[in-house]
Structures are given as structure tokens and as C-alpha cells.
């Protein structure tokens, strides 16, 4: 027999969503500001309502049952609609509004000061949490832990980071496209040589570990040419690679998006940029579309719509 929604405590659905996000009774309790015992009792009521275990204990935490997995999207959409309804009628600035972003650095570092000022001007009591874009950031967007992501994707046909391979639940907007350039310290010996592929490959390279991979489209293009670069140093992000490339006493070179010239100017790094020594077809495979990413359930969320517009405007002005 179909059960009536009027007989269900709707707070239980909030508990269910947090359990799905955290996969932990203790962590869900912390977010709800209640005891783990209270969350366990709520879970027992939910299990009785749905006549399903919903979660099973594993060494890695709570694992959702097939029924729980099938309900995840509907539950998240329902909670999002509830949040939007609560935000609508008030002509006051919402209190305690949180902005959670995952962004490639130094992209965010270039614009974060201006972006944070805009956020606080509009929402004086807002809190902002920024994390580096990483291999699990898309999942964080899907699970509601991140409002919006801002990062580069890839264009190489064999890349796993193509925009066309994004999950169906993710919406996106390409704000600008950029090519990687080569960055060398001002007195690098390569600057006294003919700038060609042989010179580019003669010196040791700094690479970044991107989404748990030490190689990217640049290495795929080189492989197609039967060539390979010597990666002497791997670092977590572009800002570290640029900082190291600018240091004296070595001949390391870095490859990073051209927009990084703004970051270098901001921090007065003594670096010189050179284009990658490839032809037009090869460079096309290296084009990086820098993309805003958010979950489809947030496409009409006023907070996310405003944030997208703010980032878009800043990109046109700063990048």
C-alpha cells in the first residue's frame, strides 16, 4: 500500500541526504549538530519506511544499497528545490550562505581577491570555501559538496578529460580557451638557442600531477611524433611548477597555460614564455577549454546563477 508523505518526518530526508553525502553516521551527525545516536535512530526509521537497509557497513564506511543509489538524484533534487523555496520570499540578504568552489590554481588565485569582494559585498555574512581541483572534484559536485568547479579540460581525441566525456548530470560553460606555453627562467641557456622541438626536449621538464596522472595531452602529442620529454620533477600544480622554473641554479622548464602570465606578473616571477614548438594541427590537440562546471540540479539556483555570472565577468576582465 502506498504510504502518505504526511506520515513521514521530513527531517528524516535531510538526514538521509547527509548520510549519502558523508557515508558516515558520525559525520552526518556533526553536520546536523546532533548525536550519532540520534542519526542512528533516524536511519532505523528510514529503513522501516523504505523497507530496505539503505546502507550497509563496510571498512570504508557506509555503502548505499541499490535502492538508495536509485533515489540519490531524486533526493538531491528535492532538497535543492526546498532550499530554493526557502530562499525566495525574503528580500533580506540570506544569513550564513556558503559558497564552496573547486578551482584550478593559479586560475583562482588571479581572480579570488576580486571574486571574494563581490561575494561579501552581496552577501556580507557569507562564508567561502575553496579547494584545489582534483581527481574527485566532479564527484564532489555531484554529491553536493562543491557548488561550482572551474578548471581546464583537454582537447586531445584520446584524452579522458574531454568535455564530451563529462557525466550527464554535469552542466558546463566554456569561459575561454587557452594554449599551454613553455616557461623558462630569464637566463635559461635555451633562450640562446634556436627555439625548436630539439631544444624543447633537450632540457629537463617540470610536470604536474593532474587528476592522479603525471602525463597529459602534451605527452600524447609527443608520443605520436615518436618523441618523449624527460620529466625530472612532478609537482601538485601550475603555481609550484612556475615557482620552481623561476629559481636559479638549474635548467628545468615548465609548461603551463598562457593565462599564467597574469600570475607571473602578480608575483613578479623572472620567467620568459615561449610557444610550444608544434604545428597548428598539433597545437589544436593541446587547446585547453577552461570551463565552469555545476550540477544540473543547480542550473536555476539563484546563488549558483549569480556566482557563474560573477566569475564570467571577472574572466573577461582579468584573463
Curated annotation (Swiss-Prot):
CDD domains in UniProt: PBP2_Nitroaromatics_like
Gene3D superfamilies referenced in this protein's UniProt entry, alphabetically: Periplasmic binding protein-like II, Winged helix-like DNA-binding domain superfamily/Winged helix DNA-binding domain
All copies of domain HTH lysR-type, residue ranges: 8-65
Pfam entry (one): HTH_1
InterPro entries reported in the protein's UniProt record: LysR-type_TF, LysR_subst-bd, Tscrpt_reg_HTH_LysR, Tscrpt_reg_YidZ, WH-like_DNA-bd_sf, WH_DNA-bd_sf, YidZ_PBP2
Entry superkingdom: Bacteria
DNA-binding span(s): 25-44
Gene Ontology terms, MF aspect: DNA binding; DNA-binding transcription factor activity
Keywords: DNA-binding, Transcription, Transcription regulation
Described function: Involved in anaerobic NO protection.
NCBIfam families for this protein: PRK10216.1
PANTHER family: HTH-TYPE TRANSCRIPTIONAL REGULATOR LEUO-RELATED, HTH-TYPE TRANSCRIPTIONAL REGULATOR YIDZ
Family: Belongs to the LysR transcriptional regulatory family.
Protein name (record): HTH-type transcriptional regulator YidZ
Protein source organism: Salmonella typhi
The encoding gene: yidZ
Amino acid at each position: 500500500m502506498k504510504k502518505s508523505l504526511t506520515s513521514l518526518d521530513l527531517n528524516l530526508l535531510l538526514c538521509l541526504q547527509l548520510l549519502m553525502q558523508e557515508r558516515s553516521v558520525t559525520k552526518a551527525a556533526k553536520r546536523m549538530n546532533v548525536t550519532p545516536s540520534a542519526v542512528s535512530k533516524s536511519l532505523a526509521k528510514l529503513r522501516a519506511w523504505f523497507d530496505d537497509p539503505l546502507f550497509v557497513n563496510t571498512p570504508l564506511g557506509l555503502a548505499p544499497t541499490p535502492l538508495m543509489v536509485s533515489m540519490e538524484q531524486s533526493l538531491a533534487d528535492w532538497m535543492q528545490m526546498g532550499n530554493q523555496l526557502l530562499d525566495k520570499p525574503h528580500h533580506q540578504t540570506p544569513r550564513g550562505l556558503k559558497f564552496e568552489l573547486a578551482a584550478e590554481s593559479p586560475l583562482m588565485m588571479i581572480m579570488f581577491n576580486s571574486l571574494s569582494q563581490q561575494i561579501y559585498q552581496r552577501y556580507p555574512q557569507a562564508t567561502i570555501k575553496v579547494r584545489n581541483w582534483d581527481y574527485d572534484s566532479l564527484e564532489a559536485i555531484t554529491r553536493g559538496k562543491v557548488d561550482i568547479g572551474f578548471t581546464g579540460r583537454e582537447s586531445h581525441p584520446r584524452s579522458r578529460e574531454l568535455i564530451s566525456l563529462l557525466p550527464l548530470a554535469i552542466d558546463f560553460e566554456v569561459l575561454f580557451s587557452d594554449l599551454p606555453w613553455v616557461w623558462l627562467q630569464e637566463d635559461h641557456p635555451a633562450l640562446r638557442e634556436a627555439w625548436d622541438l630539439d631544444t624543447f626536449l633537450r632540457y629537463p621538464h617540470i610536470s604536474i600531477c593532474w587528476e592522479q596522472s603525471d602525463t597529459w595531452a602534451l605527452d600524447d602529442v609527443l608520443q605520436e611524433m615518436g618523441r618523449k620529454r624527460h620529466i625530472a620533477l612532478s609537482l601538485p600544480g601550475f603555481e609550484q611548477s612556475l615557482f620552481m622554473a623561476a629559481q636559479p641554479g638549474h635548467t628545468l622548464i615548465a609548461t603551463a597555460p598562457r593565462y599564467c602570465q597574469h600570475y607571473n606578473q602578480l608575483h613578479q616571477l623572472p620567467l620568459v614564455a615561449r610557444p610550444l614548438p608544434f604545428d597548428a594541427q598539433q597545437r589544436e590537440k593541446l587547446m585547453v577549454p577552461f570551463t565552469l562546471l555545476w550540477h544540473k540540479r543547480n542550473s536555476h539556483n539563484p546563488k549558483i546563477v549569480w556566482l557563474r555570472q560573477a566569475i564570467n565577468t571577472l574572466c573577461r576582465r582579468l584573463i
